[in-house]
Regions:
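Extracytosolic helix-loop segments that constitute the early lumenal/periplasmic catalytic or substrate-binding loops
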Residues: 23-24, 38-63, 70-73, 295
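Membrane-interface anchor segments at the N-terminal boundary of transmembrane helices
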Residues: 8, 87-91, 333-334, 344-346, ...
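Transmembrane-helix signature of polytopic, membrane-embedded enzymes
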Residues: 9-14, 104-130, 148-149, 181, ...
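Membrane-proximal stem/loop segments at transmembrane-domain junctions that anchor or position
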Residues: 262-383
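Multi-pass, polyprenyl lipid-linked donor-dependent membrane glycosyltransferases
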Residues: 35-38, 66, 88-99, 123-158, ...
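Short hydrophobic alpha-helices at membrane interfaces in multi-pass membrane enzymes
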Residues: 119-125, 157-197, 228-232
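Transmembrane-helix motifs of polytopic, lipid-linked glycan transferases
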Residues: 91-115, 153, 157, 416-419
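Membrane-interface alpha helices of multi-pass inner-membrane proteins
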Residues: 124-126, 188-203, 214, 240-244
Length: 485
């Protein structure tokens, strides 16, 4: 078998296996009524059939800006062919995710040395195709599959620049010449920024990728002689990000009379109160994913039981009793108004003043671990529990085995990525992928109140590209032979 046929065979087999796994998830474990899924479906259908990007408020179809329009546009495109079918949307996501597998493999190959790119590409496509975590999200009507694709494409494009094994794009003297923007429309910085801009219309935090790129370039080009290159790259990426957002911002200005390039931080309607005091309180202790279900996702809709709150959320019995009284007050009305929210905020302030490192360091670090190492079974009929091992094994062995399998697979991907990062530490592009994973993780650990494991799935294109590097093997060829391979 020729190397080319071997490559094609591996691609075909990997994509076939990946398609089978994703289709199984979509047909066996579809999720249409969880989280924002019903909201996205309604937004897309109203936009497609009634020409209004909105949903009923007090019985009246009302234009809103609560979600950026990228994913509803994707759903509307699917619905225009298949009707209001969540299953059709999932199958479209299966196809899109298989394309993402190829993009990730290309990214992995670009990071590898020339002589190993074929092997690393094959490893990358298999690792991406068989990844159950990204694959499982094709079975839910949420943004993850689309934004992972756009993130992978953006990274691949940006790796064509100085961020990866690309070319130097500008001499310092060009800053004062007409050539400063020569070739801008085809420049990897501009094109990568454009892809990130479209990704921002799917998930508003996608520009974290541009911030990561900027940090890498800032460290590399901190000397005055390199400032021209730094300024040019920053301008091109910034303009690229903004251009796709302009139509959305214009729509919000003309329809809602509001300056909004993204979406409201807490997806609130105009005049709707956001209980930030409650969030301040949970930020002093909440780091486990299970506690999100029991607290944050119940606010203003369900009762919150003091018995569901872990003991480490209280510094004393008196504080626990105080919080019990506050929660009783909430449970009577199932609404957190400004007065009640102030009580949560006061408890949060007191807890932070007593233990500032807990709020600002310990909890974010624990959330980091939760983001990366919580069993990624949230879309499956599995409890996600491993402890106590003996009890879980005896009570529900299949559930335990599913959770254990997903935990081990997640650990294998992370360990392979760490090994790949070490092997690639002197190659162009290594630092960009690492910084992106770190920046995105720290952002969600510190500034987002719910440590959901899905928030780091956008790191998986970078993670899998790194995880493929150990499969490069070693070359016995001479340096000259490597260059011609």
């Amino acid at each position: 078998m020729t190397p080319q046929n071997k490559l094609r065979g591996n691609i075909a087999l990997a994509l076939l296996a990946g398609c089978a796994m994703r289709t199984y998830f979509a047909l066996k474990f579809p999720v249409t009524d969880s989280g924002d899924a019903p909201f996205y479906i309604e937004l897309a259908w109203n936009w497609l059939k009634k020409g209004v990007y909105g949903f009923p408020v007090n019985g009246v179809l009302t234009a809103v800006d609560m979600r950026v329009p990228g994913y509803p546009a994707f759903l509307a495109a699917v619905f225009s062919f298949a009707g209001q079918s969540a299953r059709a949307a999932m199958l479209a996501q299966v196809a899109l995710d298989l394309v993402t597998c190829i993009v990730i493999a290309l990214l992995a190959a670009r990071l590898a040395p020339d002589w190993a790119r074929r092997r690393v590409f094959i490893a990358g496509v298999w690792l991406a195709a068989l990844c159950p975590f990204t694959g499982n999200y094709t079975a839910v009507v949420l943004t993850e599959t689309l934004v992972i694709f756009l993130t992978a494409v953006a990274i691949l494009v940006l790796m064509q620049s100085d961020l990866g094994p690309g070319r130097s794009v500008l001499r310092e003297a060009d800053l004062t010449r007409a050539g400063f923007l020569r070739g801008a429309l085809s420049d990897p910085y501009f094109l990568g920024g454009m892809v990130v801009g479209f990704g921002t219309l799917v998930r508003p935090e996608t520009p974290l990728l541009i911030i990561s790129a900027g940090l890498v370039l800032l460290v590399r080009w901190w000397r005055p002689r390199d400032w021209a290159k730094l300024i040019r790259a920053g301008v091109l990426m910034g303009v690229g990000v903004l251009l796709p957002l302009v139509p959305w911002a214009a729509r919000n200005w003309f329809v809602l009379h509001d300056v909004q390039f993204l979406a409201p931080r807490y997806s609130e309607l105009p005049g709707e109160y956001t209980p930030l005091g409650f969030t301040d309180w949970t930020n002093t202790w909440l780091w486990r994913y299970r506690d999100v279900y029991l607290t944050q996702w119940k606010v203003n809709s369900e009762e919150i039981s003091i018995d569901d709150i872990p003991a480490y959320a209280f510094d004393s019995d008196a504080e626990r009793q105080r919080m019990s009284d506050i929660l009783d007050e909430y449970n009577d009305v199932l609404t957190i108004d400004p007065a009640l929210d102030a009580k949560f905020r006061e408890v949060a302030r007191e807890r932070t003043s007593r233990h500032p490192l807990r709020t600002y360091v310990a909890v974010p670090l624990k959330r980091t671990l939760a983001l990366w190492f919580t069993p990624r079974t949230e879309l499956l009929p599995s409890s996600g529990k491993l402890w106590p091992v003996r009890s879980e094994w005896e009570d529900d062995r299949p559930d335990f085995l599913v959770t254990l399998s997903f935990t081990l697979i997640n650990g294998i991907y992370v360990l392979l990525a760490l090994a790949g990062a070490w092997l690639a530490r002197r190659r162009p592009g290594w630092s960009f992928l690492i910084v992106f994973c770190v920046v995105r993780t720290l952002f969600f650990a510190k500034f987002v109140e719910t440590p959901e494991p899905r928030y780091v799935l956008e790191c998986f294109p970078a993670l899998i590209a790194l995880a493929a590097q150990p499969f490069a093997g070693r070359s016995n060829q001479s340096p000259a032979a490597r260059r011609t391979n």
